[in-house]
Amino acid sequence: MLSAEEAPYQSCYCEENVYKLLEKLKPNLDDFFAVLISNDIKMIPLWKQKAERDPDVLWDYHVITISKNSDGSAKVYDFDSWIDWGVDFQTYWNQTMNEDEMKQFREKYRRKFRIIPARIYLSLLSSDRSHMLNPDGTYMKPPPEWPLIQNSTNSNLMNLIDMKLEFPETMVMDETEIRRFFSDA
């Protein structure tokens, strides 16, 4: 695995950061997943994120990488977290998803997760970065220097984070299901 410092990174472009990380890991992708996190209201509470000094942040979506080894152990790679790169899933879950603090949020804030095998993510994701444009056409945050990621369509990122939509070879899970999927056997 690359260190976080060795992996391509641009702040506020988590979907592309994960894509570029997985691209660098080819051909050894069998144990890796891109995990898109969002919900119906596009407001997901997460903790331990670098973007805020407050303990929590509300993102419209977030994308991370998780590896699931043959022994059942899982590690999380989140470019935007204060938690260690390659931390075990349970530690990441406890600190970032923070179920104790989540109790103060209404049900509509519950997160959903689209689990995409790495190879599928590399052939599926297309982003024209239009979601990062202001009304005047300028970028809200500086875009990455690498070219746009375009596969089968001009842009499907907003569809991928819509957890009601179905995509072949992807799985949408709730908080209980993802914990079960990535917890040690």
Curated annotation (Swiss-Prot):
It catalyses: N-terminal L-glutaminyl-[protein] + H2O = N-terminal L-glutamyl-[protein] + NH4(+). It comes from the Eukaryota. It holds the Pfam family Nt_Gln_amidase. The active site is at residues 14, 62, 78. Its EC number is 3.5.1.122. One of its GO terms (molecular function) is protein-N-terminal glutamine amidohydrolase activity. The keyword Hydrolase applies. Keywords: Hydrolase. Gene3D superfamilies: Protein N-terminal glutamine amidohydrolase, alpha beta roll. InterPro entries: N_Gln_amidohydro_ab_roll_sf, NTAQ1, Prot_N_Gln_amidohydro_ab_roll. GO terms for cellular component: cytosol; nucleus. PANTHER family: PROTEIN N-TERMINAL GLUTAMINE AMIDOHYDROLASE (PTHR13035:SF0). Mediates the side-chain deamidation of N-terminal glutamine residues to glutamate, an important step in N-end rule pathway of protein degradation. Conversion of the resulting N-terminal glutamine to glutamate renders the protein susceptible to arginylation, polyubiquitination and degradation as specified by the N-end rule. Does not act on substrates with internal or C-terminal glutamine and does not act on non-glutamine residues in any position. Belongs to the NTAQ1 family. Monomer. This is Protein N-terminal glutamine amidohydrolase.
